[in-house]
Amino acid sequence: MANMFALILVIATLVTGILWCVDKFVFAPKRRARQAAAQTASGDALDNATLNKVAPKPGWLETGASVFPVLAIVLIVRSFLYEPFQIPSGSMMPTLLIGDFILVEKFAYGIKDPIYQKTLIETGHPKRGDIVVFKYPEDPKLDYIKRAVGLPGDKITYDPVAKEVTIQPGCSSGQACENALPVTYSNVEPSDFVQTFARRNGGEATSGFFEVPLNETKENGIRLTERKETLGDVTHRILMVPIAQDQLGMYYQQPGQPLATWVVPPGQYFMMGDNRDNSADSRYWGFVPEANLVGKAVAIWMSFDKQEGEWPTGVRLSRIGGIH
C-alpha cells in the first residue's frame, strides 16, 4: 500500500511537472507574444483581465502546473526526509501507544528511491536501542515498528522466564564472541496499564490496553508490570504480563543455535517490541535485512486516545514530543 501510494505520488509529480515545463517554456512565451501584439494594436495599456482574455491559459494546464510545486515538495519530504506513521498496535508500549502519530526520519539509514526502496546513498546504520520502522520480512507490504536490540554479529539470548536479554557482540564468521554487553534491569514494578481479555459473540478473543490508576482495577483485566531495560547507553521501559509464558514452540530456531538463541547475520538486525509479551518480533520470525529498513522514529506529532480497531475518544497532547 505504501509503495503504491509512492508510485502514484511519483507519477502525479512527473505528469504535473511536465505540464509545468510545457507551460513555462512553450505556452507562456506564446501567450506573452499574443498579449504584446494586442497591446501594440490597441495603442492603449490593457489591464490584466483583458490580456487574459486575449491569450487565456487553459484551465487544465493552469491546474496541473499550479499543483506541481506542492506535489514536488510532498514527494521530496516524504521520500527523503520525514514520513508520518500511525501506531496501530500496543507492541511498543509503554514507549509508543495505540493512536500515536509519529515522524520517521527517512534519511537515518540511507537515501532510498521512493518506489523500489533501493539505497542510493548510505548515511548510517541502526544503533542498538533505535526505534526502527521496517518492512515486515514475511510480507514487505506491511510496515512494522520495533526496537533494534541485536546488530550484525551479535549473539542474542532471551530468557523467557526472567524475560531478560543477553547480548554478546562479535560472534559472526565463527569468531569467538566478545564479552557480553552490559544489559541491566531495574526492579519489577506495577505499571499504569491494564490489559483486558474478552471474547466476541463469534468466540474470537480480543484484547485491549487501558491506563488505570494503581488503586483501581478493571473487569477482565490484568495489571501489567514494568521495569527499565538498559542496552549499553540506551535506557527505556518494557512491559510484561505477569502470568504470561512465551510459546517457545513458535520461536524462530536458527540452524545451528539452541532455542531462544540467535546470531545476527551480516547486514541484518534483531528487533523486539517493548511490550515483551504482546509483540510478534524477531523471536518469532527472525531477522530484518538492512534493505527492509524504512527509517528511525524520532518524534510523536499527535496522539489520540483509542483502542486497536476503534475510533478515537480523545486527544493526548501531553505525548507530543521526542521518542526515547
Curated annotation (Swiss-Prot):
The chain crosses the membrane at residues 4-22, 59-77. Belongs to the peptidase S26 family. InterPro entries: LexA/Signal_pep-like_sf (IPR036286), Pept_S26A_signal_pept_1 (IPR000223), Pept_S26A_signal_pept_1_CS (IPR019758), Pept_S26A_signal_pept_1_Lys-AS (IPR019757), Pept_S26A_signal_pept_1_Ser-AS (IPR019756), Peptidase_S26 (IPR019533), Sign_pep_all-beta_subdom (IPR019766). Coiled coil: none annotated. Residues 1-3, 78-324 are periplasmic. The keyword Transferase does not apply. This is Signal peptidase I. The active site is at S91, K146. Keywords: Cell inner membrane, Cell membrane, Hydrolase, Membrane, Protease, Transmembrane, Transmembrane helix. It is an enzyme of class 3 (hydrolase).
